[in-house]
């Protein structure tokens, strides 16, 4: 085991604060509408240009072990805020730096770090309650566009694209971001339920131009096993043929004699059918079949519940207005399912999302909700170069997270004003002793910091602007993009409540840990010995005789 350096007290804290400052100073230049870019070196290819705080934080690794510890703790603030709220990483970093900086002064003056922490926690709890009080729900598409634009560094076109996508697929719908093929941003919307399984045979295609199978007003048969024997299918096929409507079969697989018979009937025009494999695997496949059943008003034919394929009737089949099947995807549009049953299923899946432990499970469950509740929208990001594409795509993803957060918990005035107004709830607080009061003061000072940094990045005098905003009331603040004072909500400068709240809570949590640190243990730097002198070159002995 390698030897360790153990550093105590002020010496340990001072080094860690240096690391905090290095990382925070690199991140905070990106804050606000006039924030600057940071250029990140890549091991191959061109550098990446970004205004995303968490992207900058993730790149920073310091040589000094103790400094690096401080930097990594603040990096944790940024990444945790990004994970929870999807945005607000720079604000969280600025708040953490301020709490650490102010707190260290009090610790150096001999105050009790644990009491300081208690004071900080008390102040943050009061501020969070105040933020929840002033928060108002997002009701209009315009507000969603404004939140998206602010998060995308005042790019209104990105905000409008996201608002348009949310209008199309609903607030529960899935919105994904992909690389576009042109210079302009594009929005593609898939209505209804889409799953990633295509036709089992190209002979089902009835629209050669688009190379897809189109079924109008079809029945949908859902079966959770393989179908290879046509005898099992015959009774239900005869009933569908009498009804004179097309049929989609969704099963684990359709093969052999069964598939061949379906294809022959299709070619001869006796019965219009198509077959696709069921989406997902294992338990997820069963759940998705059940989703399709609820969406189409049908029943999954499963032996577990005593249903067999040969006994299936028309009342077991689902129905839809239209189904389109491509080589890789199937889209069910306007299923005949009962609205109350669909709503119940969505609630059930949401409860599973709350309990899900892995991000992958949560994402898959969220997709299922979207497929039942709305649809899928794809924002294709257009740009002239790959570097610009990456930077813009990161901003679109940030804006998307911010709008989701705004829908979830509502909005507050942006530009650092919400935190500044929440100070009113803190200034009335008193701790149990002088040290706790000092902790409350630390948070009071820190909550001015985001506005100060926004103003500094805009090239204005921070103290003057902060003093003027404090004099105002409610939504009155400074719009750094235009250099004007006024009602920020009317100007469209909005922040999601969840982002502001999460940034403050995470910053205080990590900063408090740092203030209460009294010892740091790091691996000692290895002393590399100088390389040995190379040996003499052989065969040079006879050189003297040549002189």
From Swiss-Prot:
<dbReference type="GO" id="GO:0051082">
    <property type="term" value="F:unfolded protein binding"/>
</dbReference>
<feature type="binding site">
    <location>
        <position position="495"/>
    </location>
    <ligand>
        <name>ATP</name>
    </ligand>
</feature>
<dbReference type="GO" id="GO:0042026">
    <property type="term" value="P:protein refolding"/>
</dbReference>
<feature type="binding site">
    <location>
        <position position="51"/>
    </location>
    <ligand>
        <name>ATP</name>
    </ligand>
</feature>
<dbReference type="InterPro" id="IPR027410">
    <property type="entry name" value="TCP-1-like_intermed_sf"/>
</dbReference>
<keyword id="KW-0963">Cytoplasm</keyword>
<comment type="similarity">
    <text>Belongs to the chaperonin (HSP60) family.</text>
</comment>
<dbReference type="GO" id="GO:0016853">
    <property type="term" value="F:isomerase activity"/>
</dbReference>
<keyword id="KW-0547">Nucleotide-binding</keyword>
<comment type="function">
    <text>Together with its co-chaperonin GroES, plays an essential role in assisting protein folding. The GroEL-GroES system forms a nano-cage that allows encapsulation of the non-native substrate proteins and provides a physical environment optimized to promote and accelerate protein folding.</text>
</comment>
<dbReference type="GO" id="GO:0140662">
    <property type="term" value="F:ATP-dependent protein folding chaperone"/>
</dbReference>
<keyword id="KW-0143">Chaperone</keyword>
<dbReference type="InterPro" id="IPR027413">
    <property type="entry name" value="GROEL-like_equatorial_sf"/>
</dbReference>
<feature type="binding site">
    <location>
        <begin position="30"/>
        <end position="33"/>
    </location>
    <ligand>
        <name>ATP</name>
    </ligand>
</feature>
<feature type="binding site">
    <location>
        <begin position="87"/>
        <end position="91"/>
    </location>
    <ligand>
        <name>ATP</name>
    </ligand>
</feature>
<dbReference type="InterPro" id="IPR027409">
    <property type="entry name" value="GroEL-like_apical_dom_sf"/>
</dbReference>
<dbReference type="GO" id="GO:0005737">
    <property type="term" value="C:cytoplasm"/>
</dbReference>
<protein>
    <recommendedName>
        <fullName>Chaperonin GroEL</fullName>
        <ecNumber>5.6.1.7</ecNumber>
    </recommendedName>
</protein>
<keyword id="KW-0067">ATP-binding</keyword>
<keyword id="KW-0413">Isomerase</keyword>
<dbReference type="InterPro" id="IPR018370">
    <property type="entry name" value="Chaperonin_Cpn60_CS"/>
</dbReference>
<dbReference type="InterPro" id="IPR002423">
    <property type="entry name" value="Cpn60/GroEL/TCP-1"/>
</dbReference>
<feature type="binding site">
    <location>
        <begin position="479"/>
        <end position="481"/>
    </location>
    <ligand>
        <name>ATP</name>
    </ligand>
</feature>
<dbReference type="Pfam" id="PF00118">
    <property type="entry name" value="Cpn60_TCP1"/>
</dbReference>
<feature type="binding site">
    <location>
        <position position="415"/>
    </location>
    <ligand>
        <name>ATP</name>
    </ligand>
</feature>
<comment type="subunit">
    <text>Forms a cylinder of 14 subunits composed of two heptameric rings stacked back-to-back. Interacts with the co-chaperonin GroES.</text>
</comment>
<dbReference type="InterPro" id="IPR001844">
    <property type="entry name" value="Cpn60/GroEL"/>
</dbReference>
<dbReference type="GO" id="GO:0005524">
    <property type="term" value="F:ATP binding"/>
</dbReference>
